[in-house]
Design a protein with these regions (language model features):
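Alpha-helical recognition segments enriched in aromatics with Gly/Pro capping
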Residues: 113-127, 142-369, 432-441
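A conditional alpha-helix N-cap/helix-loop micro-motif detector
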Residues: 101-105, 137, 231
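Non-catalytic terminal extensions that flank enzyme cores
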Residues: 1-128, 275-324, 328, 334-337, ...
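Short, glycine-rich nucleotide/cofactor-binding loops
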Residues: 128-138
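Short, contiguous strand/loop micro-motifs
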Residues: 98, 130-132, 169-170
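Short alpha-helical segments and helix-capping/turn motifs at coil-helix boundaries
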Residues: 106-109, 139-143
Length: 442
């Protein structure tokens, strides 16, 4: 069905804004927004620039996470809704949903209604290619695959190579290398090419840039400053319009439909900016929804795992020996200071990183996970034994992923079925009210 192109004369916004009326708070200390990866699980590339609390001593921004995050406080601050038991029962049966890893959302019911009725619905989950992918990066992609297989969702995967060039001290060539490497890991997840579109900002600039420009007209400097604070370059000031393009692209290509964005909670401000743009009714789109998740903890404790800092990570290409060495050397333990004390008082699985990895899905059996937790609390299971369990499960998952990755052929050939078609590009531009100009090269 042909969509009616919007005009530039958009009506006044009569729907409530998702952007809070407060200025960006400023974190104390060194400004390290670009020293910590934005990719805490989905790098869908979050209302205020930061969420800081002097009592709990944590920091959450789209560009940095530090300290022990108070997830309930973030929900109050961001205005999202906790997932209900009824919603969980209708979402895919996945460990990250059953175990409250994804714990909140926006407009989840509309997505579920479309899925239940067999109507069009989409998932958007992307990646900022600033380095090799690690465990925290790939989990949202496997969740998206589960959605695709169980609900029939179309999955859109944007790669924000442009934003990483702007936000990181890396060359375009280096970002390009990371992009190609990351694409192999994304393809290895096993998405259905008929219902998956992978978009790379610089490679697909013919459609991304005109739409982003169209959306930028409805995004004020005051909004960008309120959400992100001061930006170092005009490129980063413009990037929220590109991000909004990612989230609205499924509807511009295939018409209005509920769209759900599974993301780590630090990335929620990006979704709210896009929802604010969609509410202006300048384009034939609905507000995208969100599924908000907790961070896969960094090996050394509170916070999230990062591929861009100095903290240790488990890369998707690590061999079993490297995984074992990394976990034994760096994984924060919830055990006691001595064997005797551990046997007597037991350990704390809620802070033990090896257990948390099992909880995030590497131990798929809920009953077995509960048994491991009980044994650890009683002192029957030692910290070293718990680490060995985590190593075994993680290496099994990585081995399967690496086999699929190694089986891929030429990247351009493998990627081709996942790219936007010429008709899809034209439809998206028309829906956004952007005339497509095409001139032959000299």
């Amino acid at each position: 069905m042909t969509q009616t192109p919007p005009t530039d004369e958009s009506p006044a916004d009569h729907r409530p804004s998702d952007i809070a009326d407060t200025p960006a708070s400023v974190a104390t200390g060194t400004d390290d927004r670009y020293d910590t990866a934005t990719d805490g699980g989905t790098d869908i590339d979050g209302d205020t620039n930061t969420e800081t609390d002097t009592n709990t001593d944590f920091l959450v921004t789209p560009y940095a996470v530090r300290g022990e995050v108070d997830y309930e406080r973030l929900l109050e601050r961001f205005g999202a809704d906790r997932l209900t038991d009824a919603q969980r029962a209708r979402l895919p049966d996945h460990p990250t949903i059953r175990r409250d890893t994804f714990y909140a959302g926006r407009d989840v019911d509309a997505f579920l209604e479309a899925a239940d009725c067999g109507e069009s619905h989409a998932i958007v989950t992307g990646r900022g290619p600033s380095g090799p992918m690690h465990l925290g990066h790939v989990l949202p992609f496997y969740l998206a695959r589960r959605f695709q297989r169980e609900t029939g969702a179309t999955v859109y995967v944007p790669l924000s190579d442009d934003e990483k060039f702007l936000a990181k001290e890396q060359s375009f060539a280096a970002i390009g290398d990371h992009t190609r490497d990351n694409l192999r890991d994304i393809l290895a997840v096993g998405f259905d090419p008929e219902r998956t579109r992978i978009v790379i900002d610089t490679a697909d600039a013919d459609v991304i840039y005109p739409i982003a420009t169209r959306l930028a007209k409805h995004l004020t400097p005051a909004t960008v400053e309120a959400v992100y604070g001061d930006q170092d370059t005009v490129g980063l000031q413009f990037y929220p319009a590109v991000q909004a393009t990612h989230l609205l692209l499924p509807q511009l290509v295939a018409g209005r439909q509920p769209t759900l964005v599974p993301i780590a909670v630090d990335q929620d401000p990006h979704v709210r900016v896009c929802r604010d743009i969609a509410a202006k009714e300048a384009l034939p789109v609905d507000k995208p929804g969100a599924l908000l998740g907790r961070f896969l903890p960094g090996l050394e404790g509170p916070g999230k795992m990062s591929a861009s800092g100095e903290t240790p990570t488990i890369a998707l290409t690590d061999d079993p020996e490297t995984v074992a060495e990394t976990i034994h050397a760096h994984a924060y333990s919830g055990g006691r200071s001595s064997l005797e004390a551990h046997r007597e008082h037991g350990g704390d699985p809620t802070v033990d990183v090896a257990f948390q990895y099992l909880r995030y899905g590497f131990e798929p059996d809920d009953d077995r996970l509960a048994e491991i937790a009980a044994d650890y609390r009683s002192g029957a299971l030692l910290s070293g034994d718990l680490k060995e369990l985590a190593i075994e499960r993680i290496t099994d998952v990585l081995a399967a992923h690496q086999r699929r990755r190694d089986a891929l052929g030429d990247l351009e050939t493998e990627l081709e079925p996942y790219r936007l078609t010429a008709d899809e590009r034209a439809t998206a531009l028309e829906a956004a009210g952007v005339p497509r100009l095409s001139f032959p090269a000299r």
